[in-house]
Amino acid sequence: FSTKGNGLVKAEPDMNSPQGLRFVRYKNDPKNPNSISSNDVYFTYQDSQGRIWVGLLGGGLNLISEANGTIAFKHKYNGLKQYPLYGLYMEVRTMTEDNDGRIWVGTMDGLMSFDGHFTNPEEIQFETYRQVSERSNVADNDIYVLYKDSESQIWVSVFGGVLNKLVHYD
């Protein structure tokens, strides 16, 4: 479950609980570099490889990894080494994946994408896309929704209600 200010909450089966569930909360811990990078969770997404991604407001994109029963969050501060460095793309609102396995990330600062066929998160090469024009303003880059329709076309909705079709990408 995504929360505003209280981190990420995971529900696990627990037959000893009256509800049959146990809830585990993951919050940012400044002393733990493998903790989630922000407590403001906006979006979670599972890609075609089964990986769980977490979009955060102020914390960018996190990838959940699990080893020996321990959960770790990979992000720009500890494992996504190629993440944009200049302070943009830290408010992640939405994600989708195209039919070629490319993952698209909508942020308040524009669109970001990367090849989902990777073995090591440190090797992910992020590409960024921003609207720049004479009439451009912040709203042109503020992406609310990425939607893949039944024909696998990706649609981009930005602040102010503008809807764009992602036509060509390499």
Segment roles from a protein language model:
Residues 1-170:
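Carboxylate-rich, polar loop motifs that coordinate divalent cations or form catalytic acidic clusters
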